[in-house]
């Protein structure tokens, strides 16, 4: 799965490791302003230890983690009979943005999913995240005919 940056012309793409947590938290903090140590610890634990199929990837340049994709594979959720990969985190160090890191990660993920015979990859994006929406659109993602519903628990009653 690992790609050699000298032969592939880009970052080395590899599976994420538990030791990547601090770097993920630091990259996310620089972007979001939030420190989500517990969130990333849980996410990595589920991705690395609890998942039947491990699809989360990291991108390295010169031995430093500069980007990551976190996701999972679901079987039969929400009435879908076929397996579906879910991409829930795309993270690239700001200093390495717009250098093809996210694209390289996504290309490797798609290659891996095809090898697993998983035919669809889904993600959700906030409507105001225009840069991320643009990236996904350029990568071939399109809206699906599904309606996501939400209820504020405090308003229920």
What do the PLM-derived regions correspond to, one by one?
Residues 1-6, 124, 137-157:
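Terminal substrate-recognition subdomain of acyl/acetyltransferases
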Residues 4-6, 11, 18-19, 26-82, ...:
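Acetyl-CoA-dependent GNAT
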Residues 23, 86, 131, 148:
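Amphipathic alpha-helical recognition patches that constitute DNA-binding helices
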Residues 34, 99, 130:
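Loop/helix-junction capping segments adjacent to catalytic residues or to phosphate/diphosphate-binding pockets
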Residues 92, 98-111, 138:
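Conserved acetyl-CoA-binding loop-helix of GNAT-fold acetyltransferases
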Residues 103, 115, 127-145:
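Conserved active-site alpha-helix within GNAT-family acetyltransferase domains
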Residues 113-125:
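Conserved GNAT acetyl-CoA-binding A-motif
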């Amino acid at each position: 799965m690992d790609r050699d940056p000298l032969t592939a012309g880009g970052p080395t793409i590899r599976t994420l490791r538990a030791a990547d947590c601090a770097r993920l938290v630091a990259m996310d903090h620089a972007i979001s302003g939030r420190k989500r140590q517990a969130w990333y610890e849980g996410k990595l634990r589920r991705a690395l230890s609890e998942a039947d199929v491990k699809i989360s990837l990291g991108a390295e340049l010169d031995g430093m983690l500069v980007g990551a994709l976190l996701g999972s594979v679901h079987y039969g959720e929400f009435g879908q009979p076929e397996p579906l990969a879910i991409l829930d985190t795309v993270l690239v160090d700001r200093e390495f943005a717009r250098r093809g890191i996210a694209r390289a990660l996504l290309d490797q993920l798609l290659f891996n999913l095809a090898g697993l015979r998983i035919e669809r990859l889904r993600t959700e994006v906030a409507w105001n995240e225009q840069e991320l929406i643009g990236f996904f659109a350029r990568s071939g993602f399109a809206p699906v005919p599904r309606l996501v519903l939400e209820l504020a628990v405090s308003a229920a009653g």
